[in-house]
Amino acid sequence: MAKITKVQVGEALVGDGNEVAHIDLIIGPRGSPAETAFCNGLVNNKHGFTSLLAVIAPNLPCKPNTLMFNKVTINDARQAVQMFGPAQHGVAMAVQDAVAEGIIPADEADDLYVLVGVFIHWEAADDAKIQKYNYEATKLSIQRAVNGEPKASVVTEQRKSATHPFAANA
């Protein structure tokens, strides 16, 4: 029986400084809204917002098929290279490691679609941190999505004690 039978959502914030990674993630099976979003996202680029396949290396896309999209406008070539280089590699490796480790069942990988929203700060400079943090945040997002975490009861319980690092009163 399939483990991932519906669209699931994951989120994670990892790292610090301008290289912080904040991932918003959707995973779902063939025939689901995740597949539709994947196809639409791949062909509907807008100025400053570009979607791209997550590839481990050129000619080696990760499986499940994974589409990355930027969450803030890409303003210059440096920021584009960070998205198409360290962030892309980190995301792709996280997806493939999730398959290798059984988080995503290998027998389902060819029939799933993953969409990953990536944040690249306009002043990010350390490519190694960008790659590392995006890897960690993507993998954590996948784990949370596949496991249906956090549960509504946990969010409700922690809603007043949790702190948001960018909130007005942080």
Curated annotation (Swiss-Prot):
Segments forming a coiled coil: none
Pathway as given in its UniProt record: One-carbon metabolism; formaldehyde degradation; formate from formaldehyde (H(4)MPT route): step 1/5
Main localization, broad class: cytoplasm
InterPro entries per UniProt: HCHO-activating_enzyme, HCHO-activating_enzyme_sf, Ribosomal_Su5_D2-typ_SF
Pfam families the record matches: Fae
Activity-pH dependence: Optimum pH is 7-7.5.
Catalytic activity annotation: 5,6,7,8-tetrahydromethanopterin + formaldehyde = 5,10-methylenetetrahydromethanopterin + H2O
GO BP of this protein: carbohydrate biosynthetic process; formaldehyde catabolic process; one-carbon metabolic process
Active site: 22
EC number: 4.2.1.147
UniProt entry keywords in alphabetical sequence: Cytoplasm, Detoxification, Lyase, One-carbon metabolism
Subcellular location: Cytoplasm
The keyword Flavoprotein belongs to this UniProt entry's keyword annotation: no
Gene Ontology terms: cellular component: cytoplasm
Enzyme class, UniProt record, top EC level: lyase
Activation/inhibition comment: Inhibited by the addition of an excess of H4F.
Role according to the record: Catalyzes the condensation of formaldehyde with tetrahydromethanopterin (H(4)MPT) to 5,10-methylenetetrahydromethanopterin, a reaction which also proceeds spontaneously, but at a lower rate than that of the enzyme-catalyzed reaction. Is an essential enzyme for methylotrophic energy metabolism and formaldehyde detoxification of this bacterium.
Designated name of the protein: 5,6,7,8-tetrahydromethanopterin hydro-lyase
Species, as recorded: Methylorubrum extorquens (strain ATCC 14718 / DSM 1338 / JCM 2805 / NCIMB 9133 / AM1)
Gene symbol of the encoding locus: fae
